[in-house]
Structures are given as C-alpha cells and as structure tokens.
Amino acid sequence: SSDLNGGEYTYSYDKAGRLKSMTSPLGYTKNFSYDKVDNVVKESDSLKSTTTYTYDKLHNMKSSTNALDGTTSFSYDKYGNLVKETDPLGRSNTYSYDLAGQMTSAADPLGKITAYTYDPAGNITEITKPGGRKTSYGYDKNYNVTSVTDPMGYVAKTVYDKDNRVTE
C-alpha cells in the first residue's frame, strides 16, 4: 500500500498467513509474534520498543505491557464483555452491558459516566455524556442513520435511496 506521498509500505507474512512485519516508506519496521492460537503476543519495532500481550482462555486480552508505558490490564465478564480497564497508574475505566451485550454505560477514572441507549434492533439511539449532554440518532427501516441531533440541538439529516446509498 501507499501513503499520501506515494511512499510504499511493505508487508511480510508467516506460513500461517499472519502479518509478520510491516515497514513504512521511511524504514520504520514493526514485527509481530503470535501464540499457537493466533493471538498477537509481541510487537517490536525498529526503535527498540517492545509490547507484550497476555490472554485468558477465551482469547480476551488480559494485559498489554511495554517498557515505556508499563502494564494496562483488562477484565471481562462471563460473556467476554470488557468490564474494567486499568492503566499503568492504577486508573480504571469500567463498563456495563445489557443482556444483548450492548454497552449501557462507561465510567472514567473520576466516576464520570457516559450512558448508551438502543432501539429493539440494537441501533444506538442516544449517548448521554457526563453533565447530561445528549446526542440522539434516528434510523430508517433499513437501519441507516437518518438523523443525528447533537447536544446543542443541531440536527444533521441524511437521506438514502432504495439501494441504501446516501443522496443528501
């Protein structure tokens, strides 16, 4: 592939077809290593930075560690939904889900909550940010987003043709 200046990226793959390395037009290289079930367990680059990853038995990432940033850890519920993410400084984001596995809330380390609401088809209909700022979404019968209302009340509308292509 090419960047915006026409520089070429090169990619190499292992025998299993997994990305082994990627090199940018400027020579920056990133290498990838995998475990026996295809999880990326290590990324290293030409700047001598290395990140390692661990996983649980369901292949959910448990931790991400590098020398510069430290370790970020992840916890999941029995359905595999991410419920807690803790950064190297011990700050945590927490997440809640409904029975359909849709995220209903996200709390930042300060306890500020963002809430999410869905229609029966699973489309997100509203995002409420801390302080009550709401963004609402409307859909047509084909589940295309037809309107977005921002916290200030501005409405952006989108119109689709019968083939679900944007016309306005």
Residue ranges and their predicted role:
Residues 2-3, 7-24, 28-45, 49-66, ...:
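Beta-strand elements of repeat-based all-beta scaffolds
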